[in-house]
UniProtKB/Swiss-Prot annotation:
Topological relation to the membrane, as annotated: Multi-pass membrane protein
Primary residence: endoplasmic reticulum
Region named Disordered: 34-53
TM region(s), chain numbering: 62-82, 99-119, 140-160
Pfam families: DUF1218
Subcellular localization(s) per the UniProt record: Endoplasmic reticulum membrane
Key words of the record: Developmental protein, Endoplasmic reticulum, Glycoprotein, Membrane, Signal, Transmembrane, Transmembrane helix
Protein name in the entry: Protein DESIGUAL 3
Sites carrying sugar chains: N180
Highest taxon, organism lineage: Eukaryota
Record organism: Arabidopsis thaliana
InterPro entries from the UniProt entry: DEAL/Modifying_wall_lignin1/2, DESIGUAL
Biological role: Involved, partially redundantly with VCC/DEAL1 and DEAL2, to ensure bilateral symmetry development and early leaf margin patterning, probably via the regulation of auxin and CUC2 distribution.
């Protein structure tokens, strides 16, 4: 039952991150289709100096991609549990699955931060407030979407290795208990 649940969670993680990737790419397309202002006309009507209009579609898809990415990241971290190595001694005793779990956890956070921040910059650039008007608006959604895909793969690998490490820790604890009982 645990292995079936683990497989299901991994599939959900990957599918949700693929969906976030698609949303990021669609947001990039919607942003590129947004009408551009002619600089001279726009500068007469507004002091902001923005050369393009924000895209409502890109904004909505960017928000949806960020929400989905956040939910997947929280889900994987809660279900995967807290996997850590505190000392050199812990590292020497750690199984391969535990070392992999820690490595994938770190990579998962890196992918999350990069994808979330690039999606956020792209989304804010398409908000009605135009606070990020001076930033170049190209490729933020695409980069965020690509990193969402990487996040899905790395986070799924983290979840699988964390569950395997927990199972190994539980089996090792049972064997130690049996060994201690037989000595007594």
């Amino acid at each position: 039952m645990e292995s079936e649940l683990g497989f299901l969670v991994s599939v959900v993680i990957i599918c949700a991150d693929i969906t976030a990737t698609v949303l990021g790419i669609e947001a990039e397309i919607a942003q590129s289709k947004a009408p551009h202002h002619h600089h001279q006309q726009h500068s007469r009507h507004s002091g902001s100096g923005c050369r393009r209009s924000p895209s409502d579609g890109a904004f909505a898809e960017g928000v949806a991609a960020m929400v989905l990415l956040f939910i997947v990241h929280v889900l994987a971290n809660v279900l995967g549990g807290c996997t850590y190595i505190r000392s050199k001694q812990d590292f020497k005793r750690a199984t391969a699955n535990k070392i992999l779990a820690v490595a994938f956890l770190v990579l998962s956070w890196i992918f999350f931060v990069v994808s979330y921040s690039t999606l956020m910059i792209g989304t804010l650039a398409n908000s009605r407030t135009n606070r990020l008007c001076s930033l170049p608006h190209r490729w933020f959604f695409l980069i965020g979407g690509i990193f969402c895909l990487g996040h899905g793969v790395v986070t799924s690998a983290y979840y699988v290795s964390a569950i395997a490490a927990k199972k190994e820790d539980k089996e090792n604890a049972q064997q130690e208990n049996l060994a201690n009982r037989s000595r007594a």
